[in-house]
Design a protein with these regions (language model features):
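Conserved NAD+-utilizing ADP-ribose enzyme module
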Residues: 1-37, 60-62, 73-81, 87-189
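Short, well-structured hydrophobic secondary-structure segments
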Residues: 39-71
């Protein structure tokens, strides 16, 4: 499948030298600075959950994010490069980017509008104004079934198809030089 990914220019150097690029912990720490621990845990969860759907070697812990549409790809910026890549089906996983936002914020990923409404009513019944507190604080100890319901729903990011295909993204766990079809460098505009 054809994808587009924006990466730091150092990724191109690594691809030229080694023939592949693998996201390393230090890259995430450098990019995200003071909030890197949040992203490291989030991406580690994502990889663990993704292993239910795709074979990912144990030493690969962090995903490379891919746009499924050229129209929706991140645009080039200074010190960044766009790679157009053709990735074998066994090497990528598609997820619902809209639902990924729910996971990022520790929210319940509903099956549909009716399920979302029922969930919101359940939160209201218990007087819970901020559902993320069920996962991020000790409040979840008082509502363990509700907390577990939220956590179990997160795998739906891989199974619920969005109404709008532009809300899909791909991930892979390495880029190989032979997958690169085009490289676009930042031209200053």
């Amino acid at each position: 499948m054809r994808f587009w990914t924006r990466q730091h220019e150092a990724v191109w150097d690594e691809l030229q030298k080694t023939g592949q690029y693998i996201v390393k912990k230090e890259y995430i720490e450098e990019k995200n600075d003071t909030i890197s621990e949040f992203y490291l845990k989030l991406y580690e969860w994502y990889t663990k959950a993704a292993r239910k759907y795709i074979d990912i070697p144990e030493d690969l812990k962090y995903p490379v994010w891919l746009s499924v549409s050229e129209d929706m790809m991140l645009q080039p910026t200074e010190h960044a490069i766009i790679f157009e890549v053709e990735i074998p089906e066994s090497e990528y996983l598609i997820c619902n980017f809209d639902k990924w936002g729910y996971r990022v914020n520790y929210f319940y990923v509903p099956l549909d509008e009716a399920d979302e409404k029922a969930h919101m009513e359940e939160l209201k019944k218990y007087g819970i104004a901020s559902e993320d507190s069920l996962v991020t604080t000790s409040k979840g100890n008082f509502y363990p079934l509700l907390r577990q319901k939220i956590i179990k729903s997160w795998d739906r990011i891989f199974t619920i198809q969005p109404d709008d295909p532009s809300l899909m993204v791909g991930t892979c766990w390495k880029l190989k030089k032979e997958w690169i079809k085009e490289v676009r460098f930042y031209d200053g505009e």
